[in-house]
Amino acid sequence: HSGQKKKLNFNINNFSEFKKKIIYLVLENEPDDLIYQKRGNSLFEAATHRRINSVKRIAYQRNKLIDGLNEAGDEDFVFYSDNDEMPNFINFDFEANKNKIVMFKQKLFYYKFNLFFDRIEWYGTKACKKKYLRSFNWLRDVKSKKYPNYRLDTIFSRKKYTDVKIIEEGGWHFSQIKTPKDIQTKLLNGEQHAEFKKAGKNLEHISDLVKRKIVDYDHKAKSKDYKYSKEFKLKSITIDNMPVFLKDNLNKYSEWFDFEK
């Protein structure tokens, strides 16, 4: 999202069991409407435009996913989810659902699989049938709320809807389950990279946050407000409400858990 070229790390042969189910899309170009300034005979990206260009890149990348749905039928459900979000389908009835849009209310975790961030409810995975899908960026931007039928503004809005099903206990969002070094690399290249760079967070600072089980990013701050001004403590929880895969592989991934001693 920062515009830096990245090598292709995905090797489909590492997932031979699911090879027939994977459609691997590679984006070769950038959107045409990025904002650059001219300096002599060359173009450069001004600091004031980095954020908006980053948003344009990620939206362009999201919408590329539509190319992977050529074989999907109009009645098939399409799910949009970040790769660190794991939807829980136990409480979702595919056959009985009549709602236009489905949202999964998920628990948010940081650094370790069981370090729970209880300050916000995370509406991660969203879904609709293919016949309703305008674009993946549209689905992602739909407001995480079921609006009452008397809200007339929903008739004209592309983000506010009344025909919404919210799935309680809808899964898990595992954010920054990485080493401090990898967290730094991700944040320097992610959607919020300009703000992260402005905050001046170095590797030592990130390592300290992980050690103290602290999140210093304010998810509730307004979009234009500075978001690195507060600290929030994570809670260590038991394995009871974790995904079955993690329960069954607790020893294998023990370094990515942090239980209270």
For each feature predicted by the language model, list its residue ranges.
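Generic alpha-helical propensity signal that fires on short helical segments
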Residues: 4-10, 36, 40-45, 120-122, ...
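Active-site-proximal specificity loops/subdomain of glycosyltransferases
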Residues: 2-80, 89
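Sequence-level detector for tyrosine residue identity
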Residues: 24, 36, 60, 80, ...
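Long amphipathic alpha-helical scaffold regions
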Residues: 1-2, 112
